[in-house]
Amino acid sequence: MKNINPTTTNAWKALQQHHKTQSAVTIQQLFAQEKDRFTDYSLSFNNEVLVDFSKNNVTKETLGLLRQLAQECALSEAVDAMFSGAKINKTEDRAVLHTALRNRSNSPVLVDGKDVMPEVNAVLAKMKDFCHRVISGEWKGYTGKAITDVVNIGIGGSDLGPYMVTEALRPYKNHLNLHFVSNVDGTHIAETLKKVNPETTLFLVASKTFTTQETMTNAHSARNWFLATAKDESHVAKHFAALSTNSKAVAEFGIDTNNMFEFWDWVGGRYSLWSAIGLSIALSIGFEHFEALLAGAHEMDKHFRTAPIEQNIPTTLALIGLWNTNFLGAQTEAILPYDQYLHRFAAYFQQGNMESNGKYVDRNGEVIDNYQTGPIIWGEPGTNGQHAFYQLIHQGTTLIPCDFIAPAQTHNPLADHHEKLLSNFFAQTEALAFGKTKEEVEAEFVKAGKSLDEVKEVVPFKVFTGNKPTNSILVQKITPFTLGALIAMYEHKIFVQGVMFNIYSFDQWGVELGKQLANRILPELANRETITTHDSSTNGLINQYKQWR
């Protein structure tokens, strides 16, 4: 990939000039100028996903300049480099090939001259066989009973993705009960173990190195809990499987290495749900639905790689996001799914985006001081969020672009619940875009029989300025296929922005310093001695903890 500071490009300079005139134009004025703006500013994927970006403060000129910026930042070359197995993760000297995990076309993908697809397919076949044995009841626990509960022990990408997807696809769930343990806080594993039976529980230990502190601490606690009942250590093999590459450590734990499912260093943690890390997903919904999830992502991969930039959904979303943060001054983006099953979707992409693009050093090793990189990502399902934080989105002093996501068809057609949900989905983006003027507020009061003298003091508080940018993503129905496509769409959006921010999106050195310091502090907590080796604040906190424990 070429290392290009975006602010040095002609397109960036043109965008700065364009913004000076465009910033005075409101979204409402844009709709007045372009009567069928929806048609020109929306894109469809597979006739199952509609992305409407018309309620953004962009024009055809804006989009043209943003596309020129993508061209000057050599985006198409970067896309080809990623898909072809080039080692674009330079700081770790790794390829970035989560797309190969869902390569349903099975076309060769080379890393260091070797096609990775035979190994990918072998692990998928192994996962399929394992899922069949567990789901069918053929796999027995140490007392001869079938498995009823699966506990996935992992953290970060080994937890967030599988948990998000299993929740999103609960309508496809089989009889197995899925549980997820991530936090090293003993409460998490303790509360989970209260819900399961050692005779019928299967633990999946998800750690590439089998050394991750949080995961292995929880895994050993689960093992101790299991052996308190099972007694015989040979029984561990019937109740534990590993998602790892460290066969020696896996065997030492007591897991049969035949039940170790590997993945590769070209799979980043936050992009790993497509790999063996997704075994919990496959166990929850069945392997055929897991394959449909992969297929949806693969179709989005093909769209991203082949669609012209004008029709390219992930690229368009990325460019508009860059415009909102770097020219309109937004610092956050909210992801607001109007689907309760998607209640972990925003949290998943909080990691996906912020761990990928939360960088202040560019690919040249230079400090970035004249443009913004990754935004803060957050969100909650609608309509809950409307009664929590939408107030600030509508009337606060901070610009918060939002992605609204909703399915046209619900899995639970209870009375008129879905119509009420979707009426809010449609209403919110309309309200955010167009607001309510002082004159409209006054007219409402007059219609209600109030005189303007009576209400003049309250009128300003009921005015909505509007002009708040949103994307509306309407999905025909949340299925394994469409969910796979949605996830891949956001993954590629993140990638595009990383390319254009001139940063490395696939490392995460920011998580290391805290871990190093925690490893230094841990032995200091083993006794009651007063600590003086840190700054006064850290010393004071540690010493107070020692007094209170």
Swiss-Prot record:
Gene3D superfamilies: 1.10.1390.10, Glucose-6-phosphate isomerase like protein, domain 1
EC supergroup of this enzyme: isomerase
GO MF assignments: carbohydrate derivative binding; glucose-6-phosphate isomerase activity; monosaccharide binding
Similarity remark: Belongs to the GPI family.
Reaction(s) catalysed (UniProt annotation): alpha-D-glucose 6-phosphate = beta-D-fructose 6-phosphate
Pfam families linked to this entry: PGI
NCBIfam families: PRK00179.1 (NF001211)
PANTHER family found in the cross-reference section: GLUCOSE-6-PHOSPHATE ISOMERASE
EC nos: 5.3.1.9
CDD domains named among the record's database cross-references: SIS_PGI_1, SIS_PGI_2
Keyword hit for Cytoplasm: yes
Keywords: Cytoplasm, Gluconeogenesis, Glycolysis, Isomerase
Pathway field: Carbohydrate biosynthesis; gluconeogenesis; Carbohydrate degradation; glycolysis; D-glyceraldehyde 3-phosphate and glycerone phosphate from D-glucose: step 2/4
Domain of life: Bacteria
Known role: Catalyzes the reversible isomerization of glucose-6-phosphate to fructose-6-phosphate.
Organism of provenance: Pasteurella multocida (strain Pm70)
Designated name of the protein: Glucose-6-phosphate isomerase
Active site: 355, 387, 515
Record GO cellular component, one term: cytosol
